[in-house]
Protein backbone atom coordinates (compact mmCIF):
# COMPACT_ATOMS: atom_id res chain seq x y z
CA UNK A 1 0.00 0.00 0.00
CA UNK A 2 1.53 3.28 -1.14
CA UNK A 3 0.71 6.42 0.83
CA UNK A 4 1.93 9.87 -0.15
CA UNK A 5 2.00 13.36 1.30
CA UNK A 6 1.75 16.53 -0.75
CA UNK A 7 1.85 20.16 0.33
CA UNK A 8 0.48 23.30 -1.31
CA UNK A 9 0.61 27.03 -0.67
CA UNK A 10 -2.12 28.96 -2.49
CA UNK A 11 -2.39 26.12 -4.99
CA UNK A 12 1.35 25.92 -5.68
CA UNK A 13 2.92 22.52 -5.14
CA UNK A 14 5.60 22.78 -2.44
CA UNK A 15 5.74 19.09 -1.59
CA UNK A 16 9.52 18.80 -1.57
CA UNK A 17 9.82 21.50 1.10
CA UNK A 18 9.52 21.04 4.83
CA UNK A 19 10.46 24.51 6.05
CA UNK A 20 7.97 27.38 5.86
CA UNK A 21 7.72 31.00 6.89
CA UNK A 22 5.48 31.64 9.89
CA UNK A 23 3.15 33.79 7.76
CA UNK A 24 2.23 30.92 5.42
CA UNK A 25 -0.82 28.66 5.43
CA UNK A 26 0.14 25.22 4.18
CA UNK A 27 -2.40 22.81 2.73
CA UNK A 28 -1.27 19.31 3.75
CA UNK A 29 -2.66 16.41 1.68
CA UNK A 30 -2.47 12.69 2.42
CA UNK A 31 -3.16 10.43 -0.57
CA UNK A 32 -3.87 6.74 0.00
CA UNK A 33 -5.70 3.89 -1.79
CA UNK A 34 -9.49 3.81 -1.42
CA UNK A 35 -9.33 0.07 -0.83
CA UNK A 36 -7.65 0.57 2.54
CA UNK A 37 -10.97 2.00 3.81
CA UNK A 38 -9.62 4.88 5.88
CA UNK A 39 -12.17 6.45 8.20
CA UNK A 40 -9.98 9.18 9.70
CA UNK A 41 -6.51 10.73 9.42
CA UNK A 42 -4.91 12.83 12.17
CA UNK A 43 -1.59 14.66 12.25
CA UNK A 44 0.25 14.62 15.59
CA UNK A 45 2.70 17.52 15.71
CA UNK A 46 5.36 17.64 18.41
CA UNK A 47 7.27 20.83 18.93
CA UNK A 48 10.35 21.86 20.80
CA UNK A 49 9.46 24.70 23.10
CA UNK A 50 5.97 23.31 23.66
CA UNK A 51 5.29 22.12 27.18
CA UNK A 52 6.56 18.64 27.89
CA UNK A 53 4.39 15.76 26.68
CA UNK A 54 2.03 18.08 24.78
CA UNK A 55 1.47 18.31 21.08
CA UNK A 56 -0.82 19.83 18.48
CA UNK A 57 -3.37 17.65 16.75
CA UNK A 58 -4.95 18.29 13.35
CA UNK A 59 -7.83 16.25 11.98
CA UNK A 60 -7.87 15.84 8.19
CA UNK A 61 -11.02 15.80 6.08
CA UNK A 62 -11.76 13.78 2.97
CA UNK A 63 -11.74 16.19 0.00
CA UNK A 64 -11.58 14.25 -3.27
CA UNK A 65 -10.83 11.13 -5.27
CA UNK A 66 -7.75 10.86 -7.50
CA UNK A 67 -8.04 7.74 -9.62
CA UNK A 68 -8.12 4.87 -7.14
CA UNK A 69 -6.95 7.06 -4.25
CA UNK A 70 -8.66 9.11 -1.57
CA UNK A 71 -7.29 12.54 -0.71
CA UNK A 72 -7.51 13.90 2.83
CA UNK A 73 -6.47 17.48 3.56
CA UNK A 74 -5.98 20.05 6.28
CA UNK A 75 -4.88 23.67 6.04
CA UNK A 76 -2.42 24.55 8.82
CA UNK A 77 -1.62 28.14 9.71
CA UNK A 78 2.10 28.34 10.47
CA UNK A 79 1.62 31.50 12.54
CA UNK A 80 -0.49 29.47 14.97
CA UNK A 81 2.05 26.68 15.01
CA UNK A 82 4.75 29.21 15.86
CA UNK A 83 8.42 29.63 14.98
CA UNK A 84 10.37 26.52 15.90
CA UNK A 85 11.45 23.00 15.03
CA UNK A 86 8.72 20.36 14.92
CA UNK A 87 8.23 16.70 14.14
CA UNK A 88 5.01 15.00 13.12
CA UNK A 89 3.40 11.72 12.14
CA UNK A 90 0.01 10.70 10.80
CA UNK A 91 -2.44 8.37 12.51
CA UNK A 92 -4.59 6.54 9.98
CA UNK A 93 -7.67 4.67 11.14
CA UNK A 94 -9.09 1.84 9.05
CA UNK A 95 -10.29 -1.35 10.70
CA UNK A 96 -7.27 -0.69 12.89
CA UNK A 97 -5.17 2.36 13.73
CA UNK A 98 -1.58 2.71 12.55
CA UNK A 99 0.98 5.49 12.18
CA UNK A 100 2.91 6.61 9.12
CA UNK A 101 5.98 8.82 8.93
CA UNK A 102 8.81 9.67 6.57
CA UNK A 103 9.51 7.20 3.77
CA UNK A 104 12.73 6.70 1.84
CA UNK A 105 11.48 8.41 -1.31
CA UNK A 106 10.39 12.02 -1.73
CA UNK A 107 6.77 12.59 -0.55
CA UNK A 108 6.44 8.95 0.46
CA UNK A 109 4.90 7.91 3.79
CA UNK A 110 5.60 4.58 5.42
CA UNK A 111 4.38 2.69 8.49
CA UNK A 112 6.35 3.46 11.64
CA UNK A 113 6.51 2.18 15.19
CA UNK A 114 6.29 4.62 18.08
CA UNK A 115 8.19 7.81 17.12
CA UNK A 116 10.67 6.33 14.66
CA UNK A 117 10.57 8.09 11.32
CA UNK A 118 8.89 11.34 12.37
CA UNK A 119 8.75 14.00 9.66
CA UNK A 120 10.58 17.26 10.32
CA UNK A 121 8.81 20.61 9.99
CA UNK A 122 10.63 23.91 10.39
CA UNK A 123 8.77 27.18 10.89
CA UNK A 124 11.03 30.21 10.50
CA UNK A 125 10.44 33.91 11.01
CA UNK A 126 10.57 35.23 7.48
CA UNK A 127 12.15 34.64 4.11
CA UNK A 128 15.46 36.41 3.62
CA UNK A 129 16.50 38.26 0.49
CA UNK A 130 20.08 38.92 1.52
CA UNK A 131 23.13 38.40 -0.69
CA UNK A 132 21.30 38.04 -3.99
CA UNK A 133 24.69 38.79 -5.56
CA UNK A 134 25.80 35.34 -4.42
CA UNK A 135 23.11 33.55 -6.45
CA UNK A 136 24.50 32.01 -9.62
CA UNK A 137 28.05 32.81 -8.56
CA UNK A 138 31.08 30.80 -7.49
CA UNK A 139 33.25 31.11 -4.38
CA UNK A 140 37.00 30.62 -4.25
CA UNK A 141 38.50 29.58 -0.92
CA UNK A 142 42.08 30.81 -0.50
CA UNK A 143 44.55 29.72 2.16
CA UNK A 144 46.46 32.97 1.88
CA UNK A 145 50.02 31.88 2.78
CA UNK A 146 49.96 29.20 0.08
CA UNK A 147 48.24 30.87 -2.88
CA UNK A 148 50.64 33.37 -4.45
CA UNK A 149 53.73 35.20 -3.25
CA UNK A 150 54.20 38.81 -4.32
CA UNK A 151 57.50 39.29 -2.52
CA UNK A 152 56.32 42.63 -1.12
CA UNK A 153 55.89 41.56 2.52
CA UNK A 154 58.70 41.08 5.04
CA UNK A 155 58.80 38.15 7.49
CA UNK A 156 58.13 38.79 11.17
CA UNK A 157 60.44 37.64 13.93
CA UNK A 158 60.39 33.97 15.00
CA UNK A 159 59.25 32.94 11.53
CA UNK A 160 60.70 30.19 9.34
CA UNK A 161 60.52 31.01 5.64
CA UNK A 162 60.30 28.06 3.26
CA UNK A 163 61.55 29.35 -0.08
CA UNK A 164 60.90 26.10 -1.95
CA UNK A 165 57.46 27.01 -3.31
CA UNK A 166 57.07 23.93 -5.51
CA UNK A 167 58.62 21.16 -3.44
CA UNK A 168 58.76 22.50 0.10
CA UNK A 169 57.16 20.43 2.85
CA UNK A 170 55.19 22.26 5.57
CA UNK A 171 55.78 21.53 9.24
CA UNK A 172 54.00 18.46 10.55
CA UNK A 173 53.64 16.69 13.86
CA UNK A 174 55.45 13.46 14.62
CA UNK A 175 52.06 11.83 15.15
CA UNK A 176 48.63 12.90 13.81
CA UNK A 177 47.10 15.47 16.13
CA UNK A 178 50.43 16.26 17.77
CA UNK A 179 51.75 19.74 18.45
CA UNK A 180 53.03 21.79 15.52
CA UNK A 181 54.60 25.22 15.85
CA UNK A 182 52.95 26.39 12.59
CA UNK A 183 55.44 29.23 12.17
CA UNK A 184 56.70 28.08 8.76
CA UNK A 185 55.55 30.37 5.95
CA UNK A 186 55.76 30.08 2.18
CA UNK A 187 55.08 33.79 1.63
CA UNK A 188 51.64 34.03 0.06
CA UNK A 189 49.94 37.39 0.67
CA UNK A 190 47.08 39.65 -0.35
CA UNK A 191 49.16 41.35 -3.03
CA UNK A 192 49.72 37.90 -4.49
CA UNK A 193 45.95 37.42 -4.72
CA UNK A 194 45.61 40.73 -6.54
CA UNK A 195 48.16 39.54 -9.10
CA UNK A 196 46.00 36.49 -9.85
CA UNK A 197 42.54 38.06 -9.98
CA UNK A 198 42.32 37.65 -13.75
CA UNK A 199 43.00 33.95 -13.35
CA UNK A 200 40.44 33.63 -10.55
CA UNK A 201 37.87 35.48 -12.64
CA UNK A 202 38.38 32.97 -15.49
CA UNK A 203 36.83 30.31 -13.24
CA UNK A 204 33.60 32.30 -13.00
CA UNK A 205 34.40 33.27 -9.43
CA UNK A 206 32.32 36.07 -7.93
CA UNK A 207 33.38 35.84 -4.27
CA UNK A 208 36.71 35.31 -2.51
CA UNK A 209 36.53 33.42 0.79
CA UNK A 210 39.80 34.15 2.58
CA UNK A 211 41.35 32.11 5.36
CA UNK A 212 41.91 34.28 8.47
CA UNK A 213 44.05 37.32 7.77
CA UNK A 214 44.02 39.14 11.13
CA UNK A 215 47.35 39.56 12.89
CA UNK A 216 48.44 36.23 14.41
CA UNK A 217 51.51 34.13 15.12
CA UNK A 218 50.76 31.08 12.97
CA UNK A 219 50.60 30.61 9.21
CA UNK A 220 46.91 29.62 9.40
CA UNK A 221 45.89 32.62 11.57
CA UNK A 222 43.20 30.78 13.52
CA UNK A 223 45.07 31.94 16.64
CA UNK A 224 43.99 35.58 16.34
CA UNK A 225 46.41 38.08 17.85
CA UNK A 226 44.56 41.29 16.99
CA UNK A 227 41.10 41.43 15.40
CA UNK A 228 41.61 45.06 14.46
CA UNK A 229 44.64 44.66 12.21
CA UNK A 230 45.61 42.70 9.10
CA UNK A 231 48.77 40.62 9.48
CA UNK A 232 51.84 42.41 8.13
CA UNK A 233 53.04 39.24 6.37
CA UNK A 234 49.86 39.38 4.31
CA UNK A 235 50.35 43.05 3.45
CA UNK A 236 48.58 44.82 6.34
CA UNK A 237 45.52 46.98 5.81
CA UNK A 238 47.01 48.70 2.79
CA UNK A 239 47.01 45.43 0.85
CA UNK A 240 43.42 44.72 1.89
CA UNK A 241 42.32 48.15 0.64
CA UNK A 242 43.94 47.41 -2.70
CA UNK A 243 42.35 43.96 -2.89
CA UNK A 244 38.89 45.34 -2.13
CA UNK A 245 39.31 48.02 -4.79
CA UNK A 246 40.46 45.54 -7.44
CA UNK A 247 37.76 42.97 -6.69
CA UNK A 248 35.03 45.59 -6.87
CA UNK A 249 36.27 46.57 -10.33
CA UNK A 250 35.53 43.00 -11.38
CA UNK A 251 32.20 42.74 -9.59
CA UNK A 252 33.67 40.34 -7.04
CA UNK A 253 32.99 40.18 -3.32
CA UNK A 254 35.05 39.16 -0.28
CA UNK A 255 34.13 37.26 2.86
CA UNK A 256 36.41 36.87 5.87
CA UNK A 257 36.95 33.81 8.02
CA UNK A 258 35.86 35.01 11.47
CA UNK A 259 37.31 33.15 14.45
CA UNK A 260 35.27 34.33 17.45
CA UNK A 261 35.17 31.22 19.63
CA UNK A 262 38.79 31.54 20.72
CA UNK A 263 41.79 33.83 20.40
CA UNK A 264 45.47 33.08 20.30
CA UNK A 265 47.34 32.71 23.58
CA UNK A 266 49.84 35.00 21.88
CA UNK A 267 47.48 37.94 21.45
CA UNK A 268 46.62 41.41 22.66
CA UNK A 269 43.86 39.85 24.71
CA UNK A 270 45.62 36.93 26.43
CA UNK A 271 49.28 37.92 25.91
CA UNK A 272 50.77 34.75 27.34
CA UNK A 273 54.08 35.33 25.57
CA UNK A 274 54.29 39.03 26.42
CA UNK A 275 54.71 40.00 22.78
CA UNK A 276 52.09 42.76 22.92
CA UNK A 277 52.05 46.05 24.83
CA UNK A 278 48.65 45.25 26.33
CA UNK A 279 47.85 43.85 29.77
CA UNK A 280 46.59 40.41 28.81
CA UNK A 281 44.25 38.13 30.71
CA UNK A 282 47.08 35.67 31.33
CA UNK A 283 49.20 38.42 32.87
CA UNK A 284 46.74 39.91 35.32
CA UNK A 285 43.24 39.48 36.67
CA UNK A 286 42.96 43.25 36.27
CA UNK A 287 43.24 42.92 32.50
CA UNK A 288 40.24 44.37 30.63
CA UNK A 289 40.11 41.01 28.84
CA UNK A 290 40.24 38.78 31.93
CA UNK A 291 36.49 38.06 32.01
CA UNK A 292 36.55 36.93 28.39
CA UNK A 293 38.20 33.67 29.42
CA UNK A 294 37.43 30.81 31.81
CA UNK A 295 40.34 30.16 34.15
CA UNK A 296 40.01 27.02 36.24
CA UNK A 297 43.24 27.62 38.14
CA UNK A 298 44.81 30.95 37.27
CA UNK A 299 46.87 31.50 35.20
CA UNK A 300 47.93 28.22 33.57
CA UNK A 301 44.76 26.14 33.74
CA UNK A 302 42.23 27.66 31.36
CA UNK A 303 39.54 26.47 28.97
CA UNK A 304 40.80 25.98 25.42
CA UNK A 305 39.38 24.99 22.09
CA UNK A 306 39.74 21.18 22.05
CA UNK A 307 42.39 21.49 24.79
CA UNK A 308 44.82 23.25 22.43
CA UNK A 309 46.74 25.51 24.82
CA UNK A 310 47.54 28.15 22.21
CA UNK A 311 43.79 28.66 21.59
CA UNK A 312 42.15 29.88 24.83
CA UNK A 313 38.39 29.84 24.45
CA UNK A 314 36.37 33.00 24.97
CA UNK A 315 32.89 33.31 26.45
CA UNK A 316 30.78 34.54 23.55
CA UNK A 317 28.10 35.65 26.02
CA UNK A 318 30.46 37.95 27.93
CA UNK A 319 29.15 41.47 27.41
CA UNK A 320 32.52 43.21 27.10
CA UNK A 321 33.60 40.63 24.52
CA UNK A 322 30.35 41.04 22.60
CA UNK A 323 30.76 44.80 22.64
CA UNK A 324 34.29 44.47 21.29
CA UNK A 325 33.28 42.18 18.44
CA UNK A 326 29.71 43.27 17.75
CA UNK A 327 29.29 46.74 19.20
CA UNK A 328 29.60 50.20 17.68
CA UNK A 329 33.09 50.57 16.27
CA UNK A 330 33.69 46.87 16.89
CA UNK A 331 35.29 44.21 14.75
CA UNK A 332 32.28 43.40 12.55
CA UNK A 333 31.44 47.04 11.93
CA UNK A 334 35.02 48.02 11.11
CA UNK A 335 35.61 45.41 8.42
CA UNK A 336 32.14 45.61 6.92
CA UNK A 337 32.56 49.36 6.56
CA UNK A 338 35.94 48.71 5.02
CA UNK A 339 34.10 47.01 2.16
CA UNK A 340 34.01 43.26 2.71
CA UNK A 341 30.68 41.50 2.23
CA UNK A 342 30.41 38.99 5.03
CA UNK A 343 31.92 36.42 7.35
CA UNK A 344 32.26 32.67 7.53
CA UNK A 345 32.14 31.82 11.24
CA UNK A 346 34.63 29.25 12.44
CA UNK A 347 33.16 26.58 14.78
CA UNK A 348 29.72 28.19 14.72
CA UNK A 349 28.43 25.38 16.95
CA UNK A 350 30.35 26.85 19.87
CA UNK A 351 28.90 30.35 19.53
CA UNK A 352 25.69 31.15 21.41
CA UNK A 353 22.40 31.86 19.63
CA UNK A 354 22.40 35.36 21.07
CA UNK A 355 25.91 36.03 19.76
CA UNK A 356 24.94 34.84 16.29
CA UNK A 357 21.77 36.95 16.22
CA UNK A 358 23.61 40.05 17.38
CA UNK A 359 26.39 39.49 14.86
CA UNK A 360 23.94 39.06 12.00
CA UNK A 361 22.05 42.19 13.04
CA UNK A 362 25.22 44.30 13.26
CA UNK A 363 26.52 43.01 9.93
CA UNK A 364 23.22 43.73 8.17
CA UNK A 365 23.03 47.20 9.74
CA UNK A 366 26.22 48.08 7.86
CA UNK A 367 25.42 46.15 4.69
CA UNK A 368 21.88 44.73 4.36
CA UNK A 369 23.17 42.61 1.48
CA UNK A 370 25.97 41.07 3.52
CA UNK A 371 26.13 37.39 4.41
CA UNK A 372 26.89 35.21 7.45
CA UNK A 373 28.03 31.63 6.89
CA UNK A 374 28.56 29.08 9.63
CA UNK A 375 30.96 26.17 9.85
CA UNK A 376 28.56 23.31 10.53
CA UNK A 377 29.46 19.74 9.56
CA UNK A 378 26.05 18.10 9.97
CA UNK A 379 22.41 18.83 9.15
CA UNK A 380 22.28 22.45 10.32
CA UNK A 381 18.48 22.52 10.58
CA UNK A 382 18.34 20.31 13.66
CA UNK A 383 21.89 20.40 15.03
CA UNK A 384 22.42 19.77 18.73
CA UNK A 385 25.68 21.14 20.11
CA UNK A 386 26.68 20.80 23.75
CA UNK A 387 23.24 19.37 24.58
CA UNK A 388 21.45 22.38 23.14
CA UNK A 389 19.38 22.54 19.97
CA UNK A 390 20.74 25.25 17.67
CA UNK A 391 18.43 27.73 15.94
CA UNK A 392 20.53 28.56 12.89
CA UNK A 393 17.67 28.64 10.37
CA UNK A 394 14.77 29.91 12.48
CA UNK A 395 15.66 33.49 11.59
CA UNK A 396 18.40 36.11 11.88
CA UNK A 397 21.29 33.80 12.83
CA UNK A 398 23.05 32.14 9.90
CA UNK A 399 22.26 32.92 6.28
CA UNK A 400 23.68 29.55 5.32
CA UNK A 401 26.35 26.98 6.13
CA UNK A 402 29.17 24.93 4.67
CA UNK A 403 27.57 21.93 2.99
CA UNK A 404 29.69 19.08 4.34
CA UNK A 405 26.84 16.50 4.26
CA UNK A 406 26.56 16.95 0.50
CA UNK A 407 30.33 16.63 0.06
CA UNK A 408 30.22 13.23 1.73
CA UNK A 409 27.25 12.18 -0.39
CA UNK A 410 28.98 13.19 -3.64
CA UNK A 411 32.15 11.31 -2.73
CA UNK A 412 30.17 8.22 -1.76
CA UNK A 413 28.24 8.35 -5.02
CA UNK A 414 31.01 9.24 -7.46
CA UNK A 415 33.56 6.87 -5.95
CA UNK A 416 31.39 3.95 -4.88
CA UNK A 417 28.02 4.35 -6.62
CA UNK A 418 26.09 4.82 -3.37
CA UNK A 419 22.92 6.25 -4.91
CA UNK A 420 20.83 5.78 -1.76
CA UNK A 421 23.01 8.12 0.27
CA UNK A 422 23.03 10.70 -2.51
CA UNK A 423 19.24 10.52 -2.82
CA UNK A 424 18.62 10.77 0.92
CA UNK A 425 21.01 13.72 1.28
CA UNK A 426 19.29 15.62 -1.54
CA UNK A 427 15.96 14.84 0.09
CA UNK A 428 17.20 16.03 3.48
CA UNK A 429 18.57 19.32 2.15
CA UNK A 430 15.40 20.04 0.20
CA UNK A 431 12.97 19.19 2.99
CA UNK A 432 14.89 20.42 6.05
CA UNK A 433 16.47 23.70 4.87
CA UNK A 434 14.48 26.87 4.15
CA UNK A 435 14.89 27.61 0.46
CA UNK A 436 16.62 30.94 1.01
CA UNK A 437 19.24 29.18 3.15
CA UNK A 438 19.62 26.31 0.68
CA UNK A 439 20.12 28.73 -2.22
CA UNK A 440 23.20 30.11 -0.45
CA UNK A 441 24.74 26.81 0.68
CA UNK A 442 28.51 26.72 0.40
CA UNK A 443 28.78 23.60 -1.77
CA UNK A 444 32.31 22.29 -1.43
CA UNK A 445 34.44 19.33 -2.40
CA UNK A 446 37.38 20.24 -0.22
CA UNK A 447 38.56 22.72 2.40
CA UNK A 448 41.60 23.38 4.57
CA UNK A 449 40.10 20.85 7.02
CA UNK A 450 39.72 17.94 4.58
CA UNK A 451 41.99 15.88 2.39
CA UNK A 452 42.27 17.19 -1.17
CA UNK A 453 39.31 15.99 -3.18
CA UNK A 454 41.54 14.57 -5.93
CA UNK A 455 43.38 12.50 -3.34
CA UNK A 456 40.13 11.29 -1.78
CA UNK A 457 38.78 10.17 -5.15
CA UNK A 458 41.99 8.50 -6.28
CA UNK A 459 43.17 6.62 -3.20
CA UNK A 460 41.92 4.40 -0.43
CA UNK A 461 42.35 4.86 3.31
CA UNK A 462 45.78 5.87 4.56
CA UNK A 463 45.09 4.93 8.16
CA UNK A 464 48.33 3.75 9.71
CA UNK A 465 50.56 5.96 7.61
CA UNK A 466 52.80 8.37 9.48
CA UNK A 467 52.85 12.06 8.67
CA UNK A 468 56.39 11.65 7.38
CA UNK A 469 55.16 9.02 4.91
CA UNK A 470 52.17 11.12 3.84
CA UNK A 471 54.37 14.16 3.26
CA UNK A 472 55.99 12.31 0.36
CA UNK A 473 53.09 10.16 -0.83
CA UNK A 474 51.52 10.90 -4.21
CA UNK A 475 49.11 9.05 -6.45
CA UNK A 476 50.31 6.74 -9.19
CA UNK A 477 49.60 7.75 -12.79
CA UNK A 478 46.73 5.25 -12.90
CA UNK A 479 45.23 6.57 -9.66
CA UNK A 480 45.58 10.16 -10.84
CA UNK A 481 43.88 9.45 -14.18
CA UNK A 482 40.90 7.85 -12.45
CA UNK A 483 40.72 10.60 -9.83
CA UNK A 484 40.79 13.28 -12.51
CA UNK A 485 37.80 11.73 -14.29
CA UNK A 486 35.87 11.44 -11.05
CA UNK A 487 36.71 15.00 -9.99
CA UNK A 488 35.17 16.46 -13.12
CA UNK A 489 31.98 14.48 -12.51
CA UNK A 490 31.90 15.68 -8.91
CA UNK A 491 32.36 19.33 -9.86
CA UNK A 492 29.61 19.14 -12.49
CA UNK A 493 27.29 18.00 -9.71
CA UNK A 494 28.36 20.42 -6.99
CA UNK A 495 28.20 23.35 -9.43
CA UNK A 496 24.64 22.72 -10.57
CA UNK A 497 22.68 21.74 -7.45
CA UNK A 498 21.04 24.46 -5.29
CA UNK A 499 23.62 26.60 -3.55
CA UNK A 500 26.95 28.12 -4.52
CA UNK A 501 29.97 26.01 -5.49
CA UNK A 502 33.09 26.80 -3.50
CA UNK A 503 36.44 25.88 -5.05
CA UNK A 504 39.28 25.21 -2.62
CA UNK A 505 42.30 26.86 -4.21
CA UNK A 506 44.20 24.44 -6.44
CA UNK A 507 41.51 21.76 -6.70
CA UNK A 508 40.84 23.14 -10.17
CA UNK A 509 44.39 22.39 -11.33
CA UNK A 510 44.88 18.94 -9.83
CA UNK A 511 46.47 19.60 -6.45
CA UNK A 512 46.94 16.52 -4.30
CA UNK A 513 47.30 16.23 -0.54
CA UNK A 514 46.38 14.11 2.44
CA UNK A 515 45.33 15.41 5.87
CA UNK A 516 46.42 18.76 7.32
CA UNK A 517 49.00 20.16 6.60
CA UNK A 518 49.47 18.31 3.31
CA UNK A 519 46.19 19.70 1.98
CA UNK A 520 47.64 23.21 2.29
CA UNK A 521 50.57 23.13 -0.12
CA UNK A 522 51.53 26.10 -2.33
CA UNK A 523 49.63 26.58 -5.59
CA UNK A 524 51.58 25.01 -8.50
CA UNK A 525 51.78 28.02 -10.79
CA UNK A 526 53.00 26.97 -14.24
CA UNK A 527 52.36 23.28 -13.51
CA UNK A 528 48.58 23.24 -13.65
CA UNK A 529 46.59 20.33 -15.05
CA UNK A 530 45.07 22.13 -18.03
CA UNK A 531 42.40 19.49 -18.59
CA UNK A 532 40.85 19.95 -15.15
CA UNK A 533 41.27 23.73 -15.31
CA UNK A 534 39.49 24.03 -18.65
CA UNK A 535 36.60 21.92 -17.35
CA UNK A 536 36.19 24.19 -14.30
CA UNK A 537 36.31 27.26 -16.54
CA UNK A 538 33.63 25.78 -18.82
CA UNK A 539 31.36 25.11 -15.85
CA UNK A 540 31.93 28.69 -14.67
CA UNK A 541 30.69 30.05 -17.99
CA UNK A 542 27.60 27.83 -17.90
CA UNK A 543 26.69 28.96 -14.38
CA UNK A 544 26.97 32.56 -15.48
CA UNK A 545 24.79 32.19 -18.57
CA UNK A 546 21.94 30.06 -17.18
CA UNK A 547 19.50 31.95 -14.97
CA UNK A 548 18.10 28.83 -13.27
CA UNK A 549 21.27 28.65 -11.18
CA UNK A 550 20.19 31.88 -9.47
CA UNK A 551 17.65 30.18 -7.23
CA UNK A 552 15.89 27.80 -9.60
CA UNK A 553 14.02 24.86 -8.11
CA UNK A 554 15.52 21.37 -7.95
CA UNK A 555 14.17 18.04 -9.17
CA UNK A 556 15.91 14.68 -8.92
CA UNK A 557 15.02 12.71 -12.05
CA UNK A 558 17.22 9.60 -12.01
CA UNK A 559 19.55 8.28 -9.35
CA UNK A 560 21.04 4.81 -9.59
CA UNK A 561 24.54 3.45 -9.21
CA UNK A 562 25.50 4.40 -12.78
CA UNK A 563 23.32 7.29 -13.94
CA UNK A 564 22.43 10.53 -12.18
CA UNK A 565 20.05 13.10 -13.63
CA UNK A 566 18.61 16.19 -11.98
CA UNK A 567 17.07 19.45 -13.11
CA UNK A 568 17.15 23.10 -12.08
CA UNK A 569 14.12 24.96 -13.33
CA UNK A 570 11.81 27.95 -13.26
CA UNK A 571 8.48 28.61 -14.99
CA UNK A 572 9.99 28.90 -18.47
CA UNK A 573 13.20 26.92 -18.80
CA UNK A 574 15.37 24.32 -17.15
CA UNK A 575 18.76 22.65 -17.17
CA UNK A 576 19.40 18.95 -16.75
CA UNK A 577 22.69 17.66 -15.37
CA UNK A 578 23.45 14.15 -16.61
CA UNK A 579 26.26 12.10 -15.08
CA UNK A 580 27.42 8.68 -16.22
CA UNK A 581 29.84 7.35 -13.61
CA UNK A 582 30.08 3.93 -15.23
CA UNK A 583 32.67 2.63 -17.70
CA UNK A 584 29.98 1.93 -20.30
CA UNK A 585 28.21 4.16 -22.80
CA UNK A 586 24.55 5.06 -22.29
CA UNK A 587 22.01 6.54 -24.68
CA UNK A 588 18.91 8.43 -23.64
CA UNK A 589 15.67 9.62 -25.16
CA UNK A 590 13.73 12.72 -24.21
CA UNK A 591 10.30 14.01 -25.19
CA UNK A 592 11.63 17.58 -25.00
CA UNK A 593 14.58 18.79 -27.07
CA UNK A 594 17.70 19.05 -24.92
CA UNK A 595 20.84 20.84 -26.08
CA UNK A 596 24.25 21.21 -24.52
CA UNK A 597 24.66 24.42 -22.51
CA UNK A 598 28.25 24.43 -23.73
CA UNK A 599 27.96 23.76 -27.48
CA UNK A 600 24.21 24.23 -28.09
CA UNK A 601 24.19 20.85 -29.84
CA UNK A 602 21.63 18.14 -29.25
CA UNK A 603 23.01 15.26 -27.19
CA UNK A 604 21.63 11.74 -26.93
CA UNK A 605 24.68 9.77 -25.79
CA UNK A 606 26.45 9.74 -22.42
CA UNK A 607 30.05 8.67 -22.79
CA UNK A 608 31.62 6.58 -20.01
CA UNK A 609 32.74 8.65 -17.02
CA UNK A 610 31.19 11.84 -18.36
CA UNK A 611 28.98 14.74 -17.32
CA UNK A 612 26.76 16.92 -19.48
CA UNK A 613 24.70 19.98 -18.64
CA UNK A 614 21.77 20.35 -21.02
CA UNK A 615 19.15 23.03 -21.52
CA UNK A 616 15.47 22.82 -22.37
CA UNK A 617 12.38 24.99 -22.52
CA UNK A 618 8.94 24.37 -21.09
CA UNK A 619 7.39 22.72 -18.05
CA UNK A 620 9.80 20.44 -16.20
CA UNK A 621 6.88 18.26 -15.10
CA UNK A 622 6.37 17.25 -18.73
CA UNK A 623 9.97 16.09 -19.20
CA UNK A 624 10.43 12.36 -19.70
CA UNK A 625 13.87 10.74 -19.88
CA UNK A 626 14.69 7.12 -20.61
CA UNK A 627 18.22 5.70 -20.42
CA UNK A 628 19.62 2.70 -22.29
CA UNK A 629 22.94 0.92 -21.90
CA UNK A 630 24.55 0.60 -25.35
Annotate each language-model stretch with its function:
Residues 26-34, 577-579:
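Short edge beta-strand/loop segments characteristic of extracellular beta-sandwich folds
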Residues 244-253, 261-262, 267-278, 331, ...:
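Active-site-proximal helices and loops of the catalytic beta/alpha 8
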Residues 1-27, 50-141, 147-165, 171-173:
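The feature marks proteins involved in alpha-glucan
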Residues 137, 143-207, 213-337, 359-366:
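Substrate-binding/active-site clefts of carbohydrate-active enzymes
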Residues 145, 386-387, 442-475, 491-529:
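Aromatic/acidic polysaccharide-binding cleft in carbohydrate-active enzymes
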Amino acid sequence: MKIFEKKYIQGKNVSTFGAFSHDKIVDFNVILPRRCGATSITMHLFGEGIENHKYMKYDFKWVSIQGENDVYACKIDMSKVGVGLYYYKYEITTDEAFFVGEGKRINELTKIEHNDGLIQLTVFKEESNCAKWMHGGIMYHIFVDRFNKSGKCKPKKNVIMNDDWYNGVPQFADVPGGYVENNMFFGGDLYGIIEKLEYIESLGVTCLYLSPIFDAYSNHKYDTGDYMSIDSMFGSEKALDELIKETKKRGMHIIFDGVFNHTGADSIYFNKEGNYDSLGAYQSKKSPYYEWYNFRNYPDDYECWWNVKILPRVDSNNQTYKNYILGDGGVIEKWMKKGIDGFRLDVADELSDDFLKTLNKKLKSVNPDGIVYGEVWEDASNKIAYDKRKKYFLGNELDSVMNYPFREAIIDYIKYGNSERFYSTCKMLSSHYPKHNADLLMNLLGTHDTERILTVLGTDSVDGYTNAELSQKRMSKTEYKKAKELLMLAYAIVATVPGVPCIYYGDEVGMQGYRDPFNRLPFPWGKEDKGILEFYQKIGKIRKQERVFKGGLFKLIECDSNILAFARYDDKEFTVTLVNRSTEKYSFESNISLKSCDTNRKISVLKPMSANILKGNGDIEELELEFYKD
